Amino acid sequence: MARDYPLELYRNFGIMAHIDAGKTTTTERILYYTGKSHKIGEVHDGAATMDWMEQEQERGITITSAATTTFWERTEDGKTPLSPKHRFNIIDTPGHVDFTIEVERSLAVLDGAVCLLDANAGVEPQTETVWRQADRYKVPRIVFVNKMDKIGADFFNCVKMIKDRTGATPAPIALPIGAEDKLEGIIDLVTMQEWVYQGEDLGASWIIKDVRDELKAEAEEWRGKLIELAVEQDDEAMEAYLEGNEPDVPTLRKLIRKGCLAMAFVPVTAGSAFKNKGVQPVLNSVIDYLPSPLDVPAYMGFAPGDETETRNIARSADDSQPFAALAFKIMNDPFVGSLTFTRLYSGVLKKGDQMVNSTKGKRERVGRMMMMHAINREEIDEAFAGDIIALAGLKETTTGDTLCDPANQVVLETMTFPEPVIEIAVEPKTKADQEKMGLALARLAAEDPSFRVETDFESGQTIMKGMGELHLDILVDRMKREFKVEANIGAPQVAYRETISREAEIDYTHKKQTGGTGQFARVKLVITPTEPGEGYSFESKIVGGAVPKEYIPGVEKGIKSVMDSGPLAGFPVIDFRVALIDGAFHDVDSSVLAFEIASRAAMREGLKKAGAKLLEPIMKVEVVTPEEYTGGIIGDLTSRRGMVQGQDTRGNANVINAFVPLANMFGYINTLRSMSSGRAVFTMHFDHYDAVPQNISDEIQKKYA
């Protein structure tokens, strides 16, 4: 069966933003206008189509990225199609900091993005985080300044904030007509026409007319700026413009597209999804300015087993190339079981095909294939390059794995996942719960790589580790609801780390003589601190065979066994390197095990000698508050060992930026609510590890001794 839609009509894009910028509402409107959803779901009612987990509907936030396929043809009057029908594969991503990992996963497989801003708040902390992630994956984007109906909405302040906070060049392609309760519609700067919405019904009707006289001067000024940015993308257009010839509308659109794809600037439009104003122009802009899979460079991968990971195998959006795809999300579906969301980069995949998970070197078979619309699914028999589909029943595949043609193997991107910063102990209430809990935690960990499960060997407790309090709350909640596990939950604990403060040299000999074959190994190690974030490395500087090659893996194994449990309080040791510079062996009594024991003892001694110190996670905190509470909030942050970095204003609110140890931020939301009568809000995310003051370090060591 041939493909229904040529690749140039595909748009794989995500909707990204800060929490509460109206992302799910905007996606709901898009699904409504593109005809996939006949009743608009409001987040306030807990009925939004994309938010399909129970917890999402209760909390009114989006936790997991749901993928949806829908269709749109460019229109200006809402009736006449001005382009062929385009196929949109949309990924709705969460805006809460604890779920940054979901955003990371979806950006890795998208070609473009629509970034939403709250017209009142502008570029917020999570917007900056997501923006940086999108920069890293080189994802072209357009900006929709949403909530223009809100009190304090300021489009031009948002445009300024894009420039100041992200460093990108904003290029408004539309201006709002009015704001707050006077919002009427937008001025399209490309065509110089007004879109005036009639009432606030489902945006079904609007009038297109010439720009009214009182708005003309401002619109022409902004159009001039847009044209200047656009003609910079093409020498001929620039020459013509300098000779006094402005580009016509189709040429201007092509130039804006070129600039957007090159990430030279970011097209910006405006509206209010909740009031059904300005969403159709966003859909038109997705067609006009965001890339199709053909506009994106070939995806480079490396051959399985290539330790240098030299990326010299290209896979581009072409059905005739060998099949290659990336699994970017695992989801547990109540009816189908495990679903693996997959982006096809090249080739064709048919039901029943054999494929290889090249990341793990395991074979998989294609069972059921589905096109997803939030929680509804449509069974399909084949998928093509550029498609985003869900595969049911894969046994070995987890997030970030490559699936490919067995005869033409390649490993595509491997995603990087952050280390958890917070942990809680969970204990099942009954024996039956214990068995269910093991299964539940394994499932949840397969779905979410930023969530880890470990067993504390000393206490025998199960430890859940995650990215924040909300993250772990929701996982515990899912364990209870989806897997019916009853468990007792401990108080949250900080994931401390240990490191060293100076270089140390250790010469250690391990000897054991008990009749028969003995054990003998001598190692001389140098332990050196590295820059924060550099991690651990090992190097053998042995020359002349003082320690034979076959024993060196034993040395490294011994070192690694000590890294998991540092000398101060048993936390993992980070940011150091070890060099093996000398040693000795015995022809009969030496073995890999003897060298492992020797290096383990040498490391224990060496870490103490190198001045071990305790590190704690430091969070970047932003508090937005009415001015009258500023003094009290700053005082409270300082009392939590916080370092206030500065203040700013946003609209009529004050913005306080600070670095605060995570250990002092538990339950902060309740304190902030009572201090500000519920009017202040805060966001925080992990920034770096820093040394714990000695008096607090002593307390922690006593607690964990």
Curated annotation (Swiss-Prot):
Domain tr-type G stretches: 8-294
Gene Ontology CC annotations of this record: cytoplasm
Cross-referenced Pfam families: EFG_C, EFG_III, EFG_IV, GTP_EFTU, GTP_EFTU_D2
NCBIfam families: EF-G (TIGR00484), PRK12740.1-5 (NF009381), small_GTP (TIGR00231)
UniProt keywords, alphabetically: Cytoplasm, Elongation factor, GTP-binding, Nucleotide-binding, Protein biosynthesis
Function: Catalyzes the GTP-dependent ribosomal translocation step during translation elongation. During this step, the ribosome changes from the pre-translocational (PRE) to the post-translocational (POST) state as the newly formed A-site-bound peptidyl-tRNA and P-site-bound deacylated tRNA move to the P and E sites, respectively. Catalyzes the coordinated movement of the two tRNA molecules, the mRNA and conformational changes in the ribosome.
Record-level GO BP terms: ribosome disassembly
Claim: Protease is one of the keywords in the record: no
Binding-site residues, GTP: 17-24, 92-96, 146-149
Compartment annotation: Cytoplasm
Lineage: superkingdom: Bacteria
Family membership: Belongs to the TRAFAC class translation factor GTPase superfamily. Classic translation factor GTPase family. EF-G/EF-2 subfamily.
Record's protein name: Elongation factor G
This protein's record includes keyword Protein biosynthesis: yes
MF terms (GO), sorted A to Z: GTP binding; GTPase activity; guanosine tetraphosphate binding; translation elongation factor activity
